[in-house]
Amino acid sequence: MALHLHRAERTDLLADGLGALLADPQPDPFAQELVLVAARGVERWLSQRLSLVLGCGPGRADGVCAGIAFRNPQSLIAEITGTLDDDPWSPEALAWPLLAVIDASLDEPWCRTLASHLGHFATTDAEAELRRGRRYSVARRLAGLFASYARQRPGLLAAWLDGDLGELPGDLAWQPPLWRALVTTVGADPPHVRHDKTIARLRDGPADLPARLSLFGHTRLACTDVQLLDALAVHHDLHLWLPHPSDELWRALAGFQGADGLLPRRQDTSRRAAQHPLLETLGRDVRELQRALPAARATDEFLGATTKPDTLLGWLQADIAGNAPRPAGRSLSDADRSVQVHACHGPARQIDVLREVLLGLLEDDPTLQPRDIVVMCPDIDTYAPLIVAGFGLGEVAGDCHPAHRLRVRLADRALTQTNPLLSVAAELLTIAETRATASQLLNLAQAAPVRAKFGFADDDLDTITTWVRESNIRWGFDPTHRRRYGLDTVVHNTWRFGLDRILTGVAMSEDSQAWLDTALPLDDVGSNRVELAGRLAEFVERLHHVVGGLSGARPLVAWLDALATGIDLLTACNDGWQRAQVQREFADVLARAGSRAAPLLRLPDVRALLDAQLAGRPTRANFRTGTLTVCTMVPMRSVPHRVVCLVGLDDGVFPRLSHPDGDDVLAREPMTGERDIRSEDRQLLLDAIGAATQTLVITYTGADERTGQPRPPAVPLAELLDALDQTTSAPVRERILVTHPLQPFDRKNVTPGALLGAKPFTFDPAALAAAQAAAGKRCPPTAFISGRLPAPPAADVTLADLLDFFKDPVKGFFRALDYTLPWDVDTVEDSIPVQVDALAEWTVGERMLRDMLRGLHPDDAAHSEWRRGTLPPGRLGVRRAKEIRNRARDLAAAALAHRDGHGQAHDVDVDLGDGRRLSGTVTPVFGGRTVSVTYSKLAPKHVLPAWIGLVTLAAQEPGREWSALCIGRSKTRNHIARRLFVPPPDPVAVLRELVLLYDAGRREPLPLPLKTSCAWAQARRDGQDPYPPARECWQTNRFRPGDDDAPAHVRAWGPRAPFEVLLGKPRAGEEVAGEETRLGALAARLWLPLLAAEGSV
């Protein structure tokens, strides 16, 4: 028996060679063949490829792949070392005894560094608890390091057991005694001893394995793996099927074969033999593998070069195979799109571009099928939602983008992305470890299994979000839950606080001026929402119970039981596989831990454990199903496809960022053959280049999607572009690198030849329509409305409509059109209020003022606001509440001094002439006076409604003495402003003028902003120049917003419109003596009668 080495530039040649080998039957017809594969995706492809060779008739490809066991190398190693069922030295199993050893050794002098890291010497309970929560994650990380030492440098562990520390840095001197204590605790042969015994056993006699074994598709093997394989080859035929990009490089490195694999990497000179730049920069893994392989081999076979197409990709592959660029005589043709690199604005645009490229390839080549295409992403979870949205929606997308007709199969996704119950489990752990914020619980309530459990519909969730916002829920279930943050005396803004408000709102209203303990009833709980309030309370109560069970220190089994109980209490699903998978994953965690999972764990420990368990993993079923395959770069990187797409090769993302573990002894002086994930990613790119048989498509973020700032490609991609420049006689970078515009509807996307090839780049009909519209005739921007709308039939006017219009005349125009202006979306806050800004102060003060006017004592009004949860907690909130209460109390006292008795409602019905009437109700009226009061600083928008009400009363009953008093805060701090008005001489004429303005303002936006127009009129009354004060009120500055910032004004005249938009000529019938501008004329008609009627208080 012997070791046989088979090499090829592509794995399809290796697969054919393996098929030829397996076609030679073994003596026992029932004996299984054993093939060890590097990844699940390779397994699926290899089985399909072998079925074209094995069991076929002459000239036919109708065979079957049977009698072959596909396994990964680690399962074989576990079998031959006797640890297939239970390996005490695997990182998952080793973490538990290591955790026990660490707990028992914290007081040992050698363990002081580790003990300090775990909070053993912490000076405060909070710090100690925080650091103790790292115990499992630290033990698991150290177990991984020890397993790495055992696999990649076993002599190191052997020396530590013998007391030889070698040149170990002083800051890592705690690791050898920890290792010795761990070996004593585990009680099994250390991994290096077990390894040596296994090698001796394999050399002495055959293992219980097939006589013929094959190892397929590997580009990196640890030194211990090579030693085991070498020993296994003594009594077995072991065939190594290695993809290697260059036979020339292999022969150039022949002198390195069988060399000591533990050469310091900085001393490795093998890169000098790599004459092609990509073999030098991307091929370190295969060079180091060649060094590690045994020199004694029965066969070292190169299976022949593949036929390369006469394209840029083919030239590149030929140069790599020949280990040198050979650009002479090569000229890139315009039609050659075999290598495409696309620079895009962020991940979403990369997917947009990818689907256009794929559709173009499918259109240009009718023989190309989706199964011939593979899409690989370094970060599959980032791109998976974008791919789902961009492809495969089928009938859901209707006649939209044709890429939706392509079916896509995603592989390697995290279990939390594919199983909603596991996603809920992860969210429960997050909530238990954090503050249970309003956003977190609302997000959890939107999860499909939770919605199904509690019957939350879309409208229900909108209502719940409104309740949470208005009841001022921020974070924490109750004061007890806040104890660890030192806020157990603060009940405000907790879920208990907000739910009490919601539930009391079922039975009583806020206006009842009653509360239960700290609960002020919430007004917005209608009688048709009582059941929803109960379901919300049930959801929060169950979640509180579950989170309470996810705390403290307890064994692993207790944690998993508590988490499973939480899932049962909070979710419902009709898909049995989801719950079965949860049970299976939890059982797998317990099985891995076995009887060693006795140490007590804390919540961060459990999160670290489950994060690893639920991470993305390859599965055989999701590869090569006839659809477009999307996966990470690991499982399919060496599987030949006609089109290979690499998406997301962004700088900082690829290669994966590698932060050396400060506790890793190997990282201090890495040796050849030892794993380096950045070098591994570079090898993945080299493998992917060789796997593309027709087209290589690469996308990356070449510009920031928000700022447009250019961004460089990933370094390996830049090296590929440099190599391509050396592949032909003239540089080709500018021809293969396509820089895409930000928007998919940019005219470049629809212009033939503007981006790629001679055809339009996009296949999206919507993008075409948008581009055509954008490229249409451009006209200068026009006004929002070019002229007045037709006058509606004259009709009666209600006082309520008139008052609404004069709150904001321009907004009144849009309201007449039923046009909704943009508004700020109210968001859910997660932070307890610690300060009260101007808007919040006005809201609180206005409420307190209204409560006092209704007869509530000022202290009770402040208490009511305290129970609302809008004020900061503790003394800060009390102080602010008193300040606001005092101002509101003074305003209320000033108003109540003029409000004798109960206010009366006066119905009015005024004949305006020409068959029109103004009708409505003025309330409240105290005797012959209306008294309005606001917490705001008294402004034109406050006095105008009072004036209109006064004029209406005077027109209704002209013989009675009427007046209107307006009270508010003065511009001078802590003073009260009062303005008194008496009726005009002819109130009906004033009403007619107001109605004329109302009619005009419903036909077009009137240049009549209230503050600006009032400032103009006041300046005219005082004999001053009206332009400066009016301009100051209109324009926004850095200290205050102006009228130009109002949403209605922005919509009518544009953002930051100049003051001159208000200064047109008066229309016919609007003229006023002395006014040459429309603003001046309208301001005079509206404000001068009011100003003339102002008296003294």
From Swiss-Prot:
* Further facts: In the RecBCD complex, RecB has a slow 3'-5' helicase, an exonuclease activity and loads RecA onto ssDNA, RecD has a fast 5'-3' helicase activity, while RecC stimulates the ATPase and processivity of the RecB helicase and contributes to recognition of the Chi site.
What is the superkingdom listed in this entry's lineage?
A: Bacteria
State the SUPFAM superfamilies in the record.
Answer: P-loop containing nucleoside triphosphate hydrolases (SSF52540), Restriction endonuclease-like (SSF52980)
The record ties this protein, via Pfam families, to:
Exonuc_V_gamma, RecC_C
Family (UniProt) = Belongs to the RecC family.
User: Which GO biological process categories is it annotated with?
Assistant: DNA recombination; double-strand break repair via homologous recombination
Which molecular-function annotations from GO does this UniProt entry contain?
A: ATP binding; DNA binding; DNA helicase activity; exodeoxyribonuclease V activity
Say if the entry is tagged with keyword Nucleotide-binding: yes
Q: Which GO terms describe its cellular component?
A: exodeoxyribonuclease V complex; extracellular region; peptidoglycan-based cell wall; plasma membrane
- Name the InterPro entries for this protein: DExx_box_DNA_helicase_dom_sf (IPR013986), P-loop_NTPase (IPR027417), RecC (IPR006697), RecC_C (IPR041500), Restrct_endonuc-II-like (IPR011335)
What quaternary arrangement does the UniProt entry report?
A: Heterotrimer of RecB, RecC and RecD. All subunits contribute to DNA-binding.
UniProtKB keywords = ATP-binding, DNA damage, DNA repair, DNA-binding, Exonuclease, Helicase, Hydrolase, Nuclease, Nucleotide-binding
Q: Does the keyword DNA damage apply?
A: yes
Q: What is this protein called?
A: RecBCD enzyme subunit RecC
Cite the HAMAP family for this sequence. RecC
Cited PANTHER family: RECBCD ENZYME SUBUNIT RECC (PTHR30591:SF1)
Q: What NCBIfam families does this protein map onto?
A: recC
Q: What does this protein do?
A: A helicase/nuclease that prepares dsDNA breaks (DSB) for recombinational DNA repair. Binds to DSBs and unwinds DNA via a highly rapid and processive ATP-dependent bidirectional helicase activity. Holoenzyme degrades any linearized DNA that is unable to undergo homologous recombination. In the holoenzyme this subunit recognizes the wild-type Chi sequence, and when added to isolated RecB increases its ATP-dependent helicase processivity. Unlike the case in E.coli, suppresses RecA-dependent homologous recombination, is instead required for single-strand annealing pathway repair of DSB.
